[in-house]
């Protein structure tokens, strides 16, 4: 019984420590959001269509298209 309680406590404590929703007080984390947003913006700017335009170019070559969940 003690082992089960220990495992449950360990799981709950690690969930909070490794979760993505945790807030860090480090200064470097404050800068990560604008940098990430800028990289995302640059990565999602649609390039010029290729010389041979295919019918699915709008979907699979532009990463910000919400219709392209798998691309």
UniProtKB/Swiss-Prot annotation:
Domain of life: Bacteria
Coiled coil, from the record: none
InterPro entries in UniProt: Heat-stable_enterotox_CS, Heat-stable_enterotox_STa
Disulphide bridges, residue numbers: 59-64, 60-68, 63-71
A Pfam match: Enterotoxin_ST
Segment forming the signal sequence: 1-19
UniProtKB keywords: Disulfide bond, Enterotoxin, Secreted, Signal, Toxin, Virulence
Induction field: In cultured cells, expressed only at temperatures <30 degrees Celsius. Under conditions of high osmolarity and alkaline pH (as it is the case in the host's intestine), it is expressed at 37 degrees Celsius.
Propeptide feature: residues: 20-53
Localization per record: Secreted
Other information: Transcription reached a maximum at the entry to the stationary phase and significantly varied in different Y.enterocolitica strains.
Chief localisation class: secreted
Function: Toxin which activates the particulate form of guanylate cyclase and increases cyclic GMP levels within the host intestinal epithelial cells.
GO molecular function: toxin activity
Family, as annotated: Belongs to the heat-stable enterotoxin family.
Official protein name in the record: Heat-stable enterotoxin A
Gene Ontology, cellular component aspect: extracellular space
Originating organism: Yersinia enterocolitica
